[in-house]
Every structure is written in structure tokens, then in C-alpha cells.
Amino acid sequence: MKKVAILPNIQKDKGLAVTKRLVRYLEEKGCQPRLSEAVADLAELPQYAQTETELYQNSDLLISLGGDGTLLGIGRRTAKFEKPILGINLGTLGFLTAEDKNYAEAAIDKVLKGDFKLEKRMMLTCGIAKGDERTEGIIALNDICITRDLYKI
């Protein structure tokens, strides 16, 4: 896995410190770090910038930096590309993002050595129908919540 996309929650990765640290680490390991155009701009690392489609399509591994919500959002946006996601927790407790930011490099080392177990997750698709009218389905990784107030056809 040489092409690695780093996808941070910019509210949780203050000053993109963890992102920058992992970019340097991945380079040291002979990998090709990749960032979204927006993150590359904020981190002042334009050489790693890619469009979102390029980022998801051309990466071997996606690293989610944030919490479970960040990972769920990345899972939803990248589902059609079927790429593995490594969740690094930048908060206090994560169920899906089990790896702590202080051990991110060790987790990456395990992945690069092939010392990991890939957990395939079922994705959910939900759409709303009223008579002959139908919404386009949305994709979710964990759960979907539908309420009356948020949607009206």
C-alpha cells in the first residue's frame, strides 16, 4: 500500500499537526501521501493535493483522522471506491476509530507490513418514496435515521 490518502477532520486536527506528522512519516516509509486540495492548501503542502475523486480512486489506503463520525462520513463518501480505511482517533473514545493518535505510526507500520485484519462492513442504502416520487438513495456505514420534519416531498 504505497498511495495513502490522509483525510483529517480539520476541527479535531488542530493546525493539521497530526496530518503533517503522518505525511512526513509516510514519506520516510517510501509511500506517496495524498491530501485533498483543501487540506493541502491549509497545511501548506500543495505537492500532495488531489481532487476528491483522484484521492479516493487512486489511493491504496485511506486514513481517517478524527472520531467515529469522521470515519462514518468518509465511509459514506468513498463506498463506491471500496478502499480500506484506517481510523485514527483524535478524540477521547472511539469504537470504529480504535487507533490512538499517539500510536498512529505503529498502526501504519502494521498495515504496511500486511499485519492487519480487514473488516468488511455492510453499507446501507436508504431512499424515500411517496406515490410515484422517489428520492435518490443515500449510503451510510452504520445507521440511518429518518424523521418526518427533515423531509417532505
What are these regions (language model features)?
Residues Q11, D68-T70, L93:
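Short glycine-rich anion-binding loops that position phosphate/pyrophosphate groups of nucleotides
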Residues Q47-S59:
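Short acidic low-complexity segments
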Residues G15, G69-G75:
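Short glycine/serine/threonine-rich phosphate/pyrophosphate-binding segments
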Residues G73, T78-F95:
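Gly/Ser-rich helix-loop-strand patches that form or flank binding pockets
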Residues M1-V4:
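Extreme N-terminal starter segment of soluble prokaryotic enzymes
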Residues F95-I153:
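Catalytic core of DAGKc-family lipid kinases
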Residues C31-A38:
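Short internal beta-strands
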